[in-house]
Amino acid sequence: MEDCLFCKFANGDSAVNKVFENDDFIVIRDINPQAKNHFLAIPKKHFKYLAEMTEEDSALLARILKTIPKLSDLLELGGGYRLVINQGDDAGQTVPHLHIHILSGQKMGWQPA
């Protein structure tokens, strides 16, 4: 999508420090971290909501989810980690491009609201 910041990051049209990249997605550090280690896994294909996903998109998301544990050392996930996907304004989705928050590096409680 032409005006999507995350599409620009993923496609190399806007400068960002990529921690990891493959054919499916990139990983960057969150600019407003909510944990000691806070990364974003951003699919290169644009879609905003899980409900918009095709079967192909579902396979893409599965590949991303299978890759994240393999990045354990790079992302410092050793003590455990949390994955979050916000869907919609009320959930805190601030960028209209589906992405996965990867949080680690500290003991986390459960305070979703």
Predicted features and spans:
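HIT superfamily nucleotide-processing domains
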Residues: 1-113
